[in-house]
Amino acid sequence: MSHSINGHFTPASLLKFAAPSIIMMMFMSLYTIIDGIFISRFVGSNALSSLNIVYPIINIVFAIGTMLGTGGNAIISRYMGEGKNKEAKECMTQFVVISLLISVVILVLTHMNLTSISRILGASDLLLADCDSYLSVVVSFAPAAILQCLFQSYFVTAGRPNLGLVLTMIAGILNAVLDYVFIVVCQMGISGAALATGIGQSIPAIAGLLFFTFSKGSLHFTHFRLHLRELGQACYNGSSEMISQLSNAIVTFLFNIVMMRLAGEQGVAAITILLYGQFLFNAFYLGFSIGIGPIVGFQYGAGNKKELKNIHRIAFLFVGISSVLLTIAAVTLSTPIVSVFTHDADTFRLAAPGFKIFAINFLLSGLNITSSGFFTALSNGLISAMISFCRTLVFIVLSLLILPTFLDLTGAWIAIPVAEFLTLLLSTVMHVRYFFRPGKQNYFI
């Protein structure tokens, strides 16, 4: 494994190394997006709205998994870079066990308060039954969902990124097939979509458990003593990614409330479609950050400042160029993209023009995600969390509270682009301070 992340990286080799994580994250995002397509087309726009109403609970599960996945991975890869393989294995095992315990608690509490949670999240009388149906099934697979988040990071550090890629692709394809079987053939409605998602998530979760149990490589499960300091560091390092997921829950909730007020159930369906676009786009850059994270952590632990600077340069050059290209594609193809999700005329009328405005944020979000991820890999959880917290919560909430008041629907569409722009200013200041200004805080010196 050390040879795969310890050498000199060119743009091609860095992208090749990160590609499995990128594809994995995009396939993971497709679980929910495929559900949305089948639900909207074969169940209805109200069912699509219901999925988005309860999605904050799913965000909480992903938040825990992402925190201990990316944050824990920074600890594991650093230990391996320092030659401390025993500590790396013990920490990984501990993170998996604790994540499983947390997911079981979430599962039990949600089932005990199902209808109350749906109501709190904004379900109207028209949407309540579908909200309860989807949430009750999908939260039952919380342990699988949280393990999948962890293993997508740990496979990379174990030197087996392609295994994670293959498993995620199989799970994504199975999810799509089961969506068709459960929703179209068996007429199970929104519950069928949740069941398909859960089964899909179980594939990489079970395979990951088997791999790290029987692996003879440098990273596998082992007996462990509690590493409370490392657990705290993992939570700290991964706090930005956790904040991002928790903020998604809060922002989704606020968007649902705002859109229900401005345009009713069709408004919620429209913003769901736009958020799906953002979900897939952000998954691309989150996967890239996860993919290069072990390299950054290893080079930092090994004290190789020259290669660290090289990786930084390549990463942001790639993100900048690809963001421009993907934004142009999103704006140009906005109408066919929206039409994939809905045939409902009212929903399409709201979503199609909104997507063109909303897509502006794609130009900026990749840079911000990569900035936060880079600081996470360097074990600078404070800066990473600050960027993520402002990007995914503070700036968006302020935009949502202010802009729709004066601009109605247009204010809702531009809330995230405005937040991304403000975050880019903050990220730029942090990068100048920690990467380009001479001094003890400079990671390149």
Where does each model-flagged region fall?
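Helix-loop interface residues and adjacent transmembrane-helix termini in multi-pass membrane transporters
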Residues: L30-I33, F42-S45, Y79-E82, T157-A158, ...
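Short runs within selected transmembrane alpha-helices of multi-pass transporters and secretion channels
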Residues: G69, V137-V156, L167-N175, A193-I206, ...
